[in-house]
Design a protein with these regions (language model features):
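Alpha-helix N-cap and loop-to-helix initiation/capping positions
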Residues: 48-56, 117
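Short, solvent-exposed amphipathic alpha-helices that sit
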Residues: 21, 55-67, 90-92
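Short, acidic/small-residue loops that bind anionic groups at enzyme active sites
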Residues: 124, 128-137
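Glycine-rich, Arg-bearing micro-motifs that act as flexible, cationic patches
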Residues: 102-127
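Small/aliphatic-rich secondary-structure junction motif
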Residues: 3-51, 67-76
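Structural beta-alpha unit
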Residues: 69-103
């Protein structure tokens, strides 16, 4: 049913719970897991800079992949850099490109204050995705 599961991680407690849920579902359905972290890059006047270091972003994905693999489940992942406000689009695009059957996300992330003004990434993904989205609380 869910052969390919995408889990979005951002280092929040909510995304850690989503990662655990993706592992449990992958074990139940003999699925593989694709871990994604979308890093927003602010485009300043002279250069683009990430809102977190590339090393931190890569470590976040690598740690999540290791957690999944340590559970005996095949896992891959990537860090995707996007302009601010385009995180949901990047997650949905990755889900389409990777032929994902289920997206798993936390109900909140690290950017909750900004979400009050522009809408949450999770809400946008649930509206845009062509596959089921499991929102873990």
């Amino acid at each position: 049913m869910f052969k390919h599961i995408l889990v979005a991680v951002d280092g929040s407690d909510y995304s850690r719970r989503a990662l655990q849920s993706s592992i449990e579902l992958a074990a139940k359905f003999s699925s593989d897991v694709f871990v994604i972290h979308v890093d927003e890059c602010d485009r300043g006047r002279t250069a683009a800079y990430a809102l977190e270091s590339p090393v931190e972003a890569k470590r976040l994905v690598a740690d999540a992949i290791k957690t999944v693999r340590d559970s005996g489940i095949a896992a891959t992942g990537e860090v995707c850099d996007v302009a601010p406000g385009h995180v949901a689009e990047a997650i949905v695009e990755a889900a389409n490109d990777k032929h994902i059957n289920l997206v798993v996300m936390g109900s909140r992330g690290l950017s909750d204050v900004r979400a009050l003004f522009v809408g949450s990434v999770t809400h946008k993904v649930t509206q845009m995705a062509e596959v089921p989205v499991l929102v873990d609380r």
